[in-house]
Design a protein with these regions (language model features):
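Glycine-rich beta-strand-turn "strand-cap" elements at beta-sheet edges
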Residues: 2, 30-48, 71-94
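Short, well-ordered beta-strand segments in beta-rich or mixed alpha/beta enzyme
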Residues: 2-9, 36-65
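Residues that cap or initiate secondary-structure elements
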Residues: 12-14, 55-57, 89
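Short amphipathic alpha-helical segments
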Residues: 12-35, 67-71
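Amphipathic alpha-helical interaction segments
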Residues: 21-24, 28, 43, 54, ...
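Extended interaction regions within the primary functional domain
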Residues: 62, 68, 85
Length: 94
């Protein structure tokens, strides 16, 4: 399993969430199996998103699509996106 981790500041969480929910790249069609949106408890205007994929290639394809979207919206609903694709090596639930 692979996770595309994205994080960035947002001027308004509500405005960003509306744009996220519009799903401009078609997350499910691009292979996203599951996602989580996280926010630091001390900063509601910063978001982290973990998108889970079966393959690294799916994660890379979504990241490429997001870079196009970011080029259109950076400075309006978000700024300075950082991203990384990671492989899940081990998980355990307690």
């Amino acid at each position: 399993m692979y996770i595309l981790h994205i994080e960035h500041p947002v001027p308004s969480f509500e405005g960003w969430k509306k744009a996220f929910d519009s799903d401009p790249v078609g997350r499910e069609k691009m292979g996203v199996r599951h996602y989580k949106i996280l926010r630091p408890t001390d900063n509601p205007n910063y978001v982290m998103i973990n998108l889970e994929f079966n393959t690294e290639q799916e994660a890379e394809a979504l990241l490429a699509a997001m870079k196009v979207v970011w080029g259109r919206v950076e400075g309006t609903i978000m700024t300075n996106p950082k991203s990384q694709i990671v492989e899940v090596v081990e998980t355990k639930d307690y």
